[in-house]
């Protein structure tokens, strides 16, 4: 069979050689075909493969390929094995088409073959010349030539495409390059007899997938490829000439061109990555071990993004061990980490989930400042969805984006399908159920918002998030997290949706849906985003150098109607027709400029909504109601482009004396008209609208924008002092005509008043009109750095809800308040002061000239100095006290006004709830009993109404109320700062109604009531809890009065220096506190607590009333997360007692106490031998005892050895005994001669080991019976005479002694023993 194949090879070589000589005459045609690049890679699958073209045909390639080309082709074929399998499906079809085309046109190959005559091949060798009859039979000579020429042409064309692909600039893995150099070095020591490698090589080459040529590199490399081909052709002609001379060497083998290499191995991970949960700030290291031949190249990815070495992330390789280390893990490092390994034989990967636990169990909060900085630095950065595989070669990356598979968030949120098993081993099957529902949230623009719910079910449910019916996918703006259950005892999963920064378009209904094959359940919550109210006069305006003409703006044809979000819109839509530049950083686009008019018909809707801001899309203006300003229909210009730069927010323009005169006359006219109307109380109507008259063109300079507006006061009032409310804000239209709206309730007035308004300079004059309120303020004299500004026009509040302007000003109201001068406003509401002289509407004395000059204005500011400073101080104090009473009265009248806590505090409370639900509690205060095994339908507790957060003043009552439903009726537990509230507590009264409403009432609050209140409901189906925060605030008013004494004549710079006096102050309260603890002596004890307050409080630890001082065993630490810790290491009995932690700042102090019990350390004592073993000897056949006494704590364990060999307990004739006193005995009964030897007793316990050794000798029986006549006499001779005389000698002794006497008669007694 081998001879047949060799002869066939010889004939093929001859045919190819003849074909080559004929083809060299048509070089011109070959040059043209050579210039055509091969764009479609394909396999070699010639038509003759089934006709005998087996592995034996491969040596024929040496007839037209040089040694170097053969080696390189093998290497390139191996490289092609690592080709992306995704392309092989498309290439297979291309190969079929190419194979059929090449069969038709094989007689005209597109590439000129290069022949190389091997000196080992020729008919001169007798082994290579078998008989003619053994050759394979073909139909004709012509057909055989055609078949083999087709095969040769196909393979040559394939090799040519490989060479071209190899010469391109494709980046290959390092492992491939190393492998090539290794192969080339081995080819230098080729050996001659390797008959099997040719078969293996051909199989390798036929299975290879050539690497496609990138289209952009073909033209650049075409000339280089032609030059290389020309050089090889000339070498082939030279070699063909030598072959024609018939030069051959017998004994050479056709397979001498190849050298057999060891087979490669694809990568394989022997140690995979492991998922884990780690606390924030700790060091995280991922380790994996991968093997492969050649050593694979390893790449790391996080959520589809490749990771590289950096100061934060270290990638290390030590042999086959690959490690990824995160030096300090933060919450944004949470994600799926993957490791990909690849070499020329394949790829492998392993992945793991890393969850960074922050303060909360379900947070993914990043640093807002850091995120803001990133948005400013990278405004146009677009995040792409993570890809599932990172092992995509460069050729695949050049494909269109549509060809790449899209990974949806649903896959990331899928839970494992494994079933939890019950106690009987069978899987637990249950439909999903929410153990904690979503909560309605309200936030301001730019805040971080976290939706959290908890769900359980078996199999683990699949969780999806929707906004207004639209599926939310994981992205940097919407992070979706799902924390798997820790164990079967805690089967619930924590599902979290984190919105890094909310905007008004994010308002809407959010739904979390959990489903498995047994059911689906959903939880719905509403998110209300309030407009950004933090635009102050410190340069936050982003637009400048703009000119606006209100007259032109009034005649724009179509109004702007913001469209509400629809279900088909994505979570972050770019709303059409909204003047928001989405290409700008998100911080600059917070100034929403969409216009909303508050109509009388909309007042009810506004009161129902929980928040409305400058960019609120939940309210639209009815088209049928035209607003009229000065008798003209208002027209709002539409933006020319939805991505157009937002129009500038107008600062206050400078008014010259002529304009001041016009304003002054108009205000006086309006005041007279108001006096003629029927007076009405300010409580009846407080609807104010200001507008539509401005200078024809107002130009704002950049200096005006950057600097603070002269009349814009900082009204950033501490939010914890006055009850928060949802009032409408002033919105600015593109036509620079602001619309000012105030809610129609006196509560709004009280809530809107800013405490910092009391810190402003007292106005020189104030005026009131019978029918309304006129609010004015005057400027201070200009400082050297700032120009002087004229006074602002007055805003008057008419009676009735009319959209009729009563004053004219183009100045927008500061978004932090609805009233420009709260001091004047309060003065109008409160009783007027008799010391204030009457003024006109401009705030000037009535005797002032109609056109006041700047000097006269300065003089009028000093008019109140006629009154004594003490009187002014007393009157102001009375005003402020009256204000405090009114505020308190408003709070009591409207009961409790809830306020919104920060997202950070909310997640802290969620963490407390999470731990409380897993902590054993005392018996419930309810008289409700639950069966151990529930029967019938059971429903876990659900909150129909949750607790709210309240801010009250000291001494006010407060009531926490919620409603709980569940079957059976749940038990209820109340906690304050993690400690259960007893029903015997007289201060906190707990009630429960029949409908499930539960309440906790405090009649009179004081400072110690400040904290977190949690209610937990439990029944056999599960537990659920929710929390509310109570902030008890005093009224430290007099300590804040000093800035109110500042004169109007002081400069703005001096007022700015006093701004730190407006700092917020919060009394300390503990967010986290430990309970009573039990610790073991000698170990580490840690007491952790978390406290909040402004300024940050100082903590002091007391033990039984005495301060705990830091020393070698007591350390006080503060972590970055704000957790304070007291470390005691090692713990001693002296550390037991009552610990008290006191937090103190300038507003007060707070404390908690706990009892620390120290368990005594177990006493350990090494064994001690009290009685050692004694050397002894006994006659053979007698029993023997080896005795000793050993003590130790804990009691030791005894081991017996004979000649260093352990004596088993089951050996016959030997028994071991011991008692509680430490006595130990080894009894041998009877003793034999083989028992002689050295015996060792060892005693061992946890503290140590001790041993002792003794010798046992066994004597022969005859050794004791040798008679000694001199010292031996009959034992009974002394008493014989007495006994014969009738005297009973033995009766005179005791039974023991008599027994001894009888026993002595059995043997002779040595005299020395008797003596």
Curated annotation (Swiss-Prot):
It comes from the Eukaryota. Belongs to the myotilin/palladin family. The lineage of its organism: Eukaryota, Metazoa, Chordata, Craniata, Vertebrata. CDD domains: IgI_2_Titin_Z1z2-like. Residues 779-790 have a biased composition (Pro residues). It comes from Mus musculus. This is Myopalladin. Residues 184-199, 609-623 have a biased composition (Polar residues). The keyword Disulfide bond applies. Interacts with TTN/titin, NEB, NEBL, ACTN2 and CARP. It is found in: Cytoplasm; Nucleus; Cytoplasm, Myofibril, Sarcomere; Cytoplasm, Myofibril, Sarcomere, Z line. Residues 725-741 have a biased composition (Low complexity). Residues 19-60, 81-145, 166-204, 230-266, 359-392, 535-652, 674-704, 725-747, 762-814, 840-865 are annotated as: Disordered. GO terms for cellular component: cytosol; I band; nucleoplasm; Z disc. GO terms for molecular function: actin binding; muscle alpha-actinin binding; SH3 domain binding. Residues 267-357, 432-528, 941-1025, 1068-1157, 1167-1257 form the Ig-like domain. Residues 219-240 form a coiled coil. Residues 23-35, 84-104 have a biased composition (Basic and acidic residues). Pfam families: I-set. Keywords: Actin-binding, Coiled coil, Cytoplasm, Disulfide bond, Immunoglobulin domain, Nucleus, Phosphoprotein, Repeat. The modification Phosphothreonine is found at residue 249. Residues 166-180 have a biased composition (Basic residues). One of its GO terms (biological process) is sarcomere organization. Disulfide bonds join 288-339, 453-512, 1089-1141. The modification Phosphoserine is found at residues 99, 129, 641, 754, 809, 814, 903, 924. Component of the sarcomere that tethers together nebulin (skeletal muscle) and nebulette (cardiac muscle) to alpha-actinin, at the Z lines.
């Amino acid at each position: 069979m081998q001879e047949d194949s060799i002869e066939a090879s010889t004939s093929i070589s001859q045919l190819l050689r003849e074909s080559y000589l004929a083809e060299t005459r048509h070089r011109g045609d070959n040059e043209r075909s050579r210039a055509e690049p091969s764009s479609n890679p394909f396999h070699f699958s010639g038509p003759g493969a089934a006709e005998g073209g087996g592995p034996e045909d491969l040596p024929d390639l040496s007839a037209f390929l040089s040694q170097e080309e053969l080696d390189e082709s093998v290497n390139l074929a191996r490289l092609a094995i690592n080709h992306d399998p995704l392309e092989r499906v498309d290439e297979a079809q291309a190969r079929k088409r190419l194979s059929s085309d090449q069969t038709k046109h094989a007689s005209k190959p597109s590439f000129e073959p290069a022949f190389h005559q091997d000196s080992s091949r020729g008919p001169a060798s007798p082994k290579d010349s078998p008989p003619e009859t053994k050759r394979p039979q073909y139909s004709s000579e012509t057909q055989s030539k055609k078949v083999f020429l087709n095969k040769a042409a196909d393979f040559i064309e394939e090799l040519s495409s490989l060479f071209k692909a190899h010469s391109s600039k494709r980046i290959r893995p390092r492992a491939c390059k190393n492998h090539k150099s290794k192969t080339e070095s081995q080819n230098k020591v080729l050996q001659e007899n390797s008959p099997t490698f040719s078969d293996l090589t051909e199989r390798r080459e036929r299975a290879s997938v050539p690497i496609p040529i990138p289209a952009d590199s073909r033209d650049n490399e075409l000339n280089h490829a032609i030059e290389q081909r020309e050089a090889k052709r000339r070498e082939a002609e030279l070699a063909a000439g030598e072959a024609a001379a018939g030069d051959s060497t017998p004994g050479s083998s056709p397979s001498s061109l190849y050298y057999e290499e060891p087979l490669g191995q694809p990568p394989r991970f022997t140690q995979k990555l492991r998922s884990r949960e780690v606390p924030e700030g700790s060091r995280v290291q991922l380790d994996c071990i991968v093997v492969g031949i050649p050593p694979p190249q390893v790449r790391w990815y996080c959520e589809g993004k490749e990771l590289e070495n950096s100061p934060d992330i270290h990638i290390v390789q030590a042999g086959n061990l690959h490690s990824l280390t995160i030096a300090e893990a933060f919450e944004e490092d949470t994600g799926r980490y993957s490791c990909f390994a690849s070499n020329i034989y394949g790829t492998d990967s392993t992945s793991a989930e890393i969850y960074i636990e922050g303060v909360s169990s379900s947070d993914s909060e990043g640093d807002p400042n850091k995120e803001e900085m990133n948005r400013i630095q990278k405004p146009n950065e677009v995040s792409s969805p993570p890809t599932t595989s990172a092992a995509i070669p460069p050729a695949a990356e050049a494909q269109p984006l549509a060809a790449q598979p899209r990974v949806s968030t649903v896959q990331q949120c899928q839970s494992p399908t494994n079933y939890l098993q019950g106690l009987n081993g069978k899987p637990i099957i249950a439909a999903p159920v929410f153990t904690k529902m979503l909560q309605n949230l309200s936030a301001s623009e730019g805040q971080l918002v976290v939706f959290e719910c908890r769900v359980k079910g078996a199999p683990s449910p699949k969780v999806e998030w929707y906004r207004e019916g639209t599926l939310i996918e994981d992205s940097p703006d919407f992070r979706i997290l799902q924390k798997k259950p820790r164990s079967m005892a805690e089967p619930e999963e924590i599902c979290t949706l984190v919105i890094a920064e909310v905007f008004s378009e994010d308002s809407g209904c959010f739904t979390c849906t959990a489903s498995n094959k047994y059911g689906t359940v959903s939880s719905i919550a509403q998110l209300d985003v309030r407009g950004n109210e933090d635009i102050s006069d410190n340069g936050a305006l982003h637009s400048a150098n703009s000119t606006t003409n209100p007259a032109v703006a009034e005649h724009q044809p179509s109004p702007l109607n913001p469209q509400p979000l629809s279900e088909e819109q994505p979570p972050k839509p770019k709303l059409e027709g909204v003047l928001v530049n989405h290409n700008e950083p998100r911080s600059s686009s917070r100034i929403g400029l969409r216009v909303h008019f508050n109509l009388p018909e909309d007042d009810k809707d506004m009161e129902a909504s929980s928040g409305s801001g400058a960019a609120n899309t939940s309210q639209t203006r009815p088209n049928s109601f035209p607003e009229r300003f000065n008798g003209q229909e208002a027209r709002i210009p539409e933006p020319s482009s939805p991505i157009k730069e937002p129009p500038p927010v107008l600062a206050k323009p400078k008014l010259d004396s002529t304009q001041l005169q016009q304003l002054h006359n108009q205000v006086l006219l309006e005041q007279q008209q108001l006096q003629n109307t029927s007076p009405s109380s300010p409580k009846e109507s407080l609807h104010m609208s200001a507008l539509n008259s401005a200078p024809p063109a107002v130009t704002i300079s950049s200096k005006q924008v950057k600097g603070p507006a002269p009349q814009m006061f900082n009204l950033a009032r501490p939010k914890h002092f006055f009850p928060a409310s949802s009032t409408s804000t002033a919105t600015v239209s593109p036509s620079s005509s602001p619309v000012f709206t105030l809610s129609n309730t006196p509560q709004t007035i009280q809530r809107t008043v800013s405490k910092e308004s009391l810190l402003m300079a007292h106005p020189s004059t104030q005026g009131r009109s019978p029918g309304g309120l006129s609010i004015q303020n005057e400027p201070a004299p200009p400082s050297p750095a700032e120009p002087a500004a004229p006074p602002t026009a007055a805003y008057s509040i008419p009676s009735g809800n009319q959209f009729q302007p009563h004053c004219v000003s183009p100045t927008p109201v500061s978004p932090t308040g609805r009233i420009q001068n709260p001091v004047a406003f309060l003065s109008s509401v409160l009783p007027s002061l008799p010391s204030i002289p009457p003024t006109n509407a401009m705030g000037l004395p009535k005797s002032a000239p109609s056109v006041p000059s700047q000097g006269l204005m300065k003089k009028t500011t000093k008019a109140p100095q006629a009154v004594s400073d003490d009187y002014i101080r007393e009157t102001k104090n009375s005003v402020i006290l009256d204000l405090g009473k009114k505020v308190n009265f408003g709070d009591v009248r409207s009961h409790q006004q809830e306020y919104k806590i920060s997202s950070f505090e909310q997640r802290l409370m969620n963490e407390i709830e999470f731990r409380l639900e897993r902590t054993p509690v005392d018996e419930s205060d309810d008289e409700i009993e639950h069966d151990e095994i529930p029967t019938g339908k059971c429903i876990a507790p659900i909150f129909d109404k949750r607790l709210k957060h309240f801010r009250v003043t000291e001494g006010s009552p407060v009531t926490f109320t919620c409603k709980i439903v569940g079957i059976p009726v749940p038990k209820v537990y109340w906690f304050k700062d993690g400690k259960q509230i007893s029903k015997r507590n007289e201060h906190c009264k707990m009630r429960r109604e029949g409908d499930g409403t539960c309440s906790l009432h405090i009649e009179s609050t004081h400072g110690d009531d400040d904290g977190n209140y949690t209610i937990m409901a439990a029944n056999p189906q599960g537990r659920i809890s929710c929390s509310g925060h109570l902030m008890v605030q005093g009224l430290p008013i007099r300590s804040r009065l000093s800035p109110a004494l500042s004169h109007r004549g002081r400069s703005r710079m001096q007022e700015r220096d006093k701004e730190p006096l407006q700092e917020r102050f919060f009394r300390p309260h503990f967010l986290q506190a430990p309970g009573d603890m039990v610790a073991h002596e000698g170990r580490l004890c840690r007491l952790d607590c978390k406290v909040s307050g402004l300024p940050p409080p100082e903590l002091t630890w007391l033990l039984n009333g005495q301060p705990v001082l830091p020393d070698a065993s007591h350390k006080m630490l503060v972590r970055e997360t704000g957790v304070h810790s007291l470390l005691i290491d090692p713990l001693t009995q002296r550390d037991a007692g009552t610990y008290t932690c006191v937090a103190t700042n300038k507003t007060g102090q707070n404390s908690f106490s706990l009892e620390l019990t120290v368990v005594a350390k177990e006493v350990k004592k090494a064994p001690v031998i009290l009685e050692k073993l004694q050397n002894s000897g006994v006659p053979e056949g007698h029993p023997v005892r080896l005795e000793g006494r050993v003590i130790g704590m804990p009691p030791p364990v005894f081991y017996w050895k004979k000649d260093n060999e352990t004596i088993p307990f089951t050996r016959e004739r030997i028994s071991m005994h011991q008692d509680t006193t430490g006595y130990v005995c080894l009894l041998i009964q009877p003793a034999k001669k083989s028992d002689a030897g050295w015996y060792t007793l060892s005693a061992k316990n946890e503290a140590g080991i001790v041993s002792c050794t003794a010798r046992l000798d066994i004597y022969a029986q005859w050794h004791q019976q040798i008679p000694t006549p001199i010292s031996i006499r009959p034992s009974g001779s002394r008493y014989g005479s007495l006994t014969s005389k009738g005297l009973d000698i033995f009766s005179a002794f005791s039974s023991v002694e008599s027994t001894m006497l009888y026993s002595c008669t059995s043997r002779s007694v040595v005299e020395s023993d008797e003596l």
